[in-house]
């Protein structure tokens, strides 16, 4: 049995992050660890604009939307009754920085190869590269 007690997986809803989620859940089940499923939203500087340059209203609460999206992905990938304790976590900020900070409380950090942004030709996205270089715990990049 492993010493892992907490596995953190970063997801953004992209196919690679969904694969990372299912991989991390399997590892957590195999090692008797809790699974923290983390998503990060970044504040946009400008609200969505309607016609005439007038902001659309009402503006959705990005934290609430991120939470709803996170719970939807967890349910879609792990089902109604996941095989491990799952702790959804929503944070605001830069994804790489938030994941690195969260890695201080983890025994393993799991990310997908690429997220929603970036260039299609890259094997690793900028977030996964940055996290792999600076995390405070071991990192697994799932393909």
List PLM regions with ranges.
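Histidine-centered beta-alpha loop that forms part of the nucleotide-sugar donor binding/catalytic region
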Residues: 12, 93, 114-116
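General small-molecule cofactor/ligand-binding pocket signal
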Residues: 36-38, 87-91, 140
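Structural beta-alpha unit
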Residues: 1-3, 16, 30, 76-109
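Gly/Ser-rich helix-loop-strand patches that form or flank binding pockets
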Residues: 101-143
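Small/aliphatic-rich secondary-structure junction motif
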Residues: 2-54
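Short, hinge-like loop/turn segments at secondary-structure boundaries
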Residues: 52-56, 106-107
């Amino acid at each position: 049995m492993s010493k892992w007690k907490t596995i953190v997986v970063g997801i953004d809803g992209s196919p690679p992050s969904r694969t990372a989620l299912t991989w991390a859940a399997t590892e957590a089940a195999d090692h008797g660890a809790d699974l923290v499923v983390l998503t990060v939203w970044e504040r946009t500087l400008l609200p969505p604009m309607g016609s005439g340059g007038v902001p659309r209203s009402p503006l959705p609460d990005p934290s609430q939307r991120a939470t709803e999206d996170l719970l939807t992905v967890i349910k879609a990938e792990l089902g109604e009754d996941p095989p491990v304790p799952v702790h959804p976590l929503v944070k605001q900020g830069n994804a790489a920085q938030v994941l690195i900070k969260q890695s201080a409380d983890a025994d393993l950090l799991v990310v997908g190869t690429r997220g929603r942004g970036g260039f299609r030709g890259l094997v690793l996205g900028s977030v996964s590269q940055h996290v792999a270089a600076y995390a405070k715990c071991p990192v697994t990049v799932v393909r």
